[in-house]
UniProtKB/Swiss-Prot annotation:
This is AA9 family lytic polysaccharide monooxygenase A. It comes from Aspergillus fumigatus (strain ATCC MYA-4609 / CBS 101355 / FGSC A1100 / Af293) (Neosartorya fumigata). It comes from the Eukaryota. Keywords: Carbohydrate metabolism, Cellulose degradation, Copper, Disulfide bond, Glycoprotein, Metal-binding, Monooxygenase, Oxidoreductase, Polysaccharide degradation, Secreted, Signal. The gene is AA9A. Residues 240-290 are annotated as: Disordered. The keyword Secreted applies.
Length: 290
């Protein structure tokens, strides 16, 4: 036990440069590590997925890009959390890490045909949340981004979402190397059963793999020459009601705050904009160089 704790503590500096999600938070209550979140089989669980300088023989063009490498092998032993439509959730990073790469966060969902435990994620995915830049007057390579130094992605289950079992796929994209084709993807899947929902038709939808392309501007974006609007990847956020079919790419979105406020938000979940102050105590890590 003591050795395991020491190993976890030793990981903290590194995984704040590289990291992974392992805890589902439901209405402010943290669940156990991997209780409802699928693990993966990567030798180093915190390694990102990339198109260039590939790690663990894993790219965004592979089926495992849905939930991470080998994640489906853990599906049967992973629990399925019951959550109410309209409830506030979060996906938290493991071992005290924080997101210390500049870039956006997105959250997707996909409905299982029956049980989430037997679903590989090969169906349609729709986006329920995204957040980009919260303060365009801050350092565009660091704390201009809403996710900077946070330990979780917070989002809301759409109130109009039909009941059923779903996969939730949180994703953080590190853009520090995107100018060189080295965008880094950090993601996983949680298993949930939605209750008390509505009759909406989620959309637009994409597939994983296939929804992201190597030459998409979102993944070849340079943040090293000052602020510029960032083109959000994927479809637009579903806010309830009827979706609009499939989509392979979203519109170019201005996701910045206003000039008047350094803390105005750019977080979109169910069509709302919220502030994103740093609310949690963080452990800082050494600077990562790609």
């Amino acid at each position: 036990m003591k050795l395991s704790l020491l190993a976890s503590v030793a990981l903290v500096p590194f995984v704040s440069a590289h990291y992974f999600f392992d805890v589902l938070v439901i209405d402010g209550k943290e669940t156990r590590s991997n209780e409802f979140v699928r693990s993966n089989t990567r030798p180093a669980k915190y390694n990102p997925t990339k198109w260039k300088n590939i790690r663990d023989d894993m790219t965004p063009d592979m089926p495992d890009f849905r939930c991470n490498k080998g994640a489906f092998t853990f599906a049967g032993q992973t629990g399925t959390a019951e959550v109410k439509a309209g409830s506030k959730l979060a996906m938290k990073l493991a071992v005290g890490a924080t997101m210390q790469h500049p870039g956006p966060a997105l959250v997707y969902m996909s409905k299982a045909p029956s049980s989430a435990k037997t679903y590989e994620g090969d169906g349609d995915w729709f986006k329920i949340h995204e957040e980009g830049v919260c303060n365009k007057n801050a350092d565009f390579t660091k704390d201009a981004w809403c996710t900077w130094d946070k330990d979780r992605i917070e989002f809301t289950i759409p109130a109009d979402l039909p009941d059923g079992e779903y996969l939730i796929r949180p994703e953080h994209i590190g853009l520090h190397g995107a100018h060189d084709g080295q965008a880094e993807f950090y993601y996983t899947c949680a298993q949930v059963k939605v209750v008390g929902g509505g009759t909406g038709t989620p959309g637009p939808t994409i597939k994983f793999p296939g929804g992201y392309k190597k030459d998409d501007p979102s993944f070849n974006f340079s943040l090293w020459n000052g602020y510029k609007d960032y083109p959000m990847p994927g479809p637009t956020v579903w806010t309830g009601g009827s979706g609009s079919g499939s989509s392979s790419y979203s519109k170019v979105a201005n996701v910045t705050s206003s000039d008047e406020s350094s803390q105005s938000g750019a977080s979109s979940s169910q069509g709302t904009v919220s502030t994103c102050p740093n609310k949690y105590n963080r452990r800082h890590a050494r600077q990562f160089k790609p």
